[in-house]
A protein has these predicted regions:
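Left-handed beta-helix
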Residues: 1-153
Length: 153
């Protein structure tokens, strides 16, 4: 409601300096430096590294998010294992979604991986097969969006 202050909720979590939680909820999670968690967003059982952005109304559960990732408003991750398996190339056997550094998750469509990491992930022996199997299920970001650029920059 516009003009009304709504408290955020933080339970059993660690939130680092510079991170802002705007009346969202953070439960059993760790948030790195300089993250922004927007209104009505929720983070549960997740590790979010520095410089990440979680949009208004987004719900993130069981996610390991590397630095400088961006989650669009109303996105849900970790609530539909089958959808997550189709959408996200990197997942652990128990369903934890791993987002590479500088990734962006849109409401619909494929995950956007920072262009400077795509070739690294394709060449790395530990990730090359996953990238090959998921070809067409992710997109490469434009050249003006680097993995080392924080959302606020």
């Amino acid at each position: 409601i516009y003009g009304k202050k709504t408290p955020g909720e933080v339970v059993d979590s660690l939130i680092c300096e510079g991170t802002i939680v705007c009346s969202g909820s953070v439960i059993d999670s760790m948030l790195g430096y300089d993250c922004i968690i927007h209104r009505n967003a929720s983070v549960e059982k997740s590790v979010i590294l520095s410089g990440c952005y979680i949009g208004q109304g987004a719900k993130v559960k069981n996610v390991l998010m590397d630095k400088n990732c961006h989650i669009d408003p109303s996105v849900e991750i970790g609530y539909d294992i089958e959808r997550d398996a189709e959408r996200f190339p990197f997942r652990t056997p128990n369903g934890l979604v791993v987002l590479p550094k500088g990734s962006r998750v849109h409401n619909d469509g494929p995950i956007e991986i920072a262009y400077d990491l795509v070739e690294v992930l394709r060449q790395d022996p530990s990730t090359s097969e996953i990238m090959r199997l998921h070809e067409g299920k992710y997109i490469e970001s434009s050249r003006n969006r680097h993995s080392f650029t924080a959302v606020g920059d």
